Structures are given as C-alpha cells and as structure tokens.
A protein has these predicted regions:
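Active-site helix of classical SDR
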Residues: 125, 166, 174
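Short, small/polar-rich loop/turn modules that mediate ligand/substrate recognition or access, typified
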Residues: 91, 182, 187, 243-245
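Conserved glycine-rich cofactor-binding loop
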Residues: 11, 18-19
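Residue(s) in the substrate-gating loop at a strand-loop-helix junction
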Residues: 150
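C-terminal substrate-recognition "lid" of short-chain dehydrogenase/reductases
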Residues: 84-85, 221-250, 255
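Alpha-helical segment proximal to the catalytic Tyr-Lys
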Residues: 130, 179-183, 241
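Substrate-binding pocket helix/loop in short-chain dehydrogenase/reductase
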Residues: 101-102, 106-114, 201, 213
Length: 256
C-alpha cells in the first residue's frame, strides 16, 4: 500500500496488539517506518506479529502488557525504551466487551470492561506522557497519543451498555488529557471506528441478529480495518502537530 504519512524515526507502542485492529496497526506503523512495540497479555500472538514485521525488514518488539496492571505497563515502556528509545507515538487500543442486558451482566464483567477499556487507557496514556514530558516533549512537540473509541459511544442500543459507556468515557478523557498536556508537546486524539469484523465481535455477524444489523447500515456492510489507516498514520505523525483534543468518526457511514 502507499504510505501517506511517514513514521520514520518514531517509536510506536500499540496497546492491545495481539489481534484485530492492534495487530493491524502494528504492521501498518512498521510499514510507515516506525519502530513498533506490541503490548498485550497474549505474548505468543504479539511475538508472531513482531516476527512477521521483522521478516519484512521492519523493527519490532513484543512485550507483555496487562493494561489493568500499572507495573506491567511501566515494565513494557521500560523494555521499549531499552530497545528503541522514548516512545513518542502511542495507540491505546486494548478493549473487551461483555455483551448482555444491563440487568444480566455480572459485576465482575462490568468491572473488567471498565478496568480494561477506561482505566487501561488512562494508565497507558499517563505513563507514555510522563516519559515524553521527561524527555522534553515540550520543546520537541513530538508526543502523539491516539485512543481507539467506538461509534457505540455516540449511539444508544441494547446489550452492550458497559462497553458503550466505557468508550464514551475515554473520548472525554482524551479531551481532558489533551487540555492537560497541550503545553507539554503531547497531542491526544480519539478515533471512533464503526463495526469491523474482529475477535471482540465473536460470531455475532454470522447470526440472524448480526446480519440484520449489517442490513440496517446505510451501505449494508461492515467496515474494513484499512479504512482507518490514513487517519491513524496522520495522528501519529509529525503532520498532526496542531491536532489535539479532537474526535474523528470513521465508520463508513454506519452511524448516519
């Protein structure tokens, strides 16, 4: 593919890089010239993606990362810095869902969703920003943090309230962090994808209900991962120097 924005001389850390969007972004960023650090609990999967990147001539490192555990996050950033230097492009992508009506979802399921999708984003973004600020991002203006939200944060529906609320929360968190770090050279933005066929969806879109949902979209299709590529590269690049505190809905018109 043609790379619209270069990430040469950048080091990117992708949280939640073991599958789906995270693994896709890791390969994309490597193609754009970044050193890529893949963080996730499933290290066997991140190792496979890292090996694929290295075999293609890129630079990659797979590290264990549990976004609900601050010590794990710190260790992941330590490993990244030891290998490549300060991480200056961060993607907060880790996320889980516990589908079900709100009256049926168990408390531990709710806590897991909030812990991963909201607290995890907070902790990863905070650790990255701390290190960027300590490395003089104020002068360099090189900090880029991209949060992966969801169009569910802007819609109402049945059966996934915890997930939708967590994504609405991180969108507002992103704006607040952007304001907090605006004079420190750290930009924070949120991308809201539409429905994409990934592991988090399971086999939902093969069911009658899932097929009906797709049929209700204006273009009657799921979104392709690659439709996010240009925006993700842009927000992580030097070209996005003046973009912070923004939300971008990229959903193939699904929310219209």
């Amino acid at each position: 593919m043609q790379i619209p924005f270069s990430l040469a001389n950048r080091t990117a850390l992708i949280a939640g890089a073991s599958s789906g969007l995270g693994a896709h972004f890791a390969e994309l960023f490597a193609q754009a010239g970044a050193n890529v650090v893949l963080g996730a609990r499933r290290t066997d999967r991140t190792a496979e993606v890292a090996d694929k990147i290295i075999e293609a001539g890129g630079n990659a490192l797979a590290v264990p990362m549990d976004v609900t555990d601050e010590s794990s996050i710190i260790a992941a950033f330590d490993a990244a810095e030891s290998k490549f230097g300060v991480v200056d492009s961060i993607v907060c992508n880790a996320g889980i869902s516990v589908p079900g009506r709100s009256t049926d979802v168990p408390i531990d399921g709710l806590q897991n969703v909030i812990g991963t999708n909201f607290v995890g984003v907070y902790l990863v973004a905070r650790e990255g920003a701390k290190r960027l600020i300590a490395s003089d991002s104020r002068a360099k203006e090189n900090g880029r943090i991209t949060i992966i939200g969801s169009i569910t944060s802007r819609l109402t529906g049945e059966g996934d309230s915890a997930y939708a609320a967590s994504k609405a929360g991180v969108a507002h968190l992103g704006r607040n962090l952007a304001r907090e770090w605006v004079r420190q050279g750290v930009n924070v933005n949120t991308v809201h994808p539409g429905y994409i066929a990934t592991e988090i969806q399971g086999d939902w879109f093969q069911t009658e209900g899932g097929k009906n949902q797709i049929a209700a979209f204006p273009r009657r299709r799921l979104q392709e991962m690659s439709s996010l590529d240009a925006m993700m590269l842009y927000l992580s690049s030097d070209a996005a120097n003046s973009v912070t505190g923004s939300e971008f809905v990229i959903d193939d018109g699904q929310s219209l």
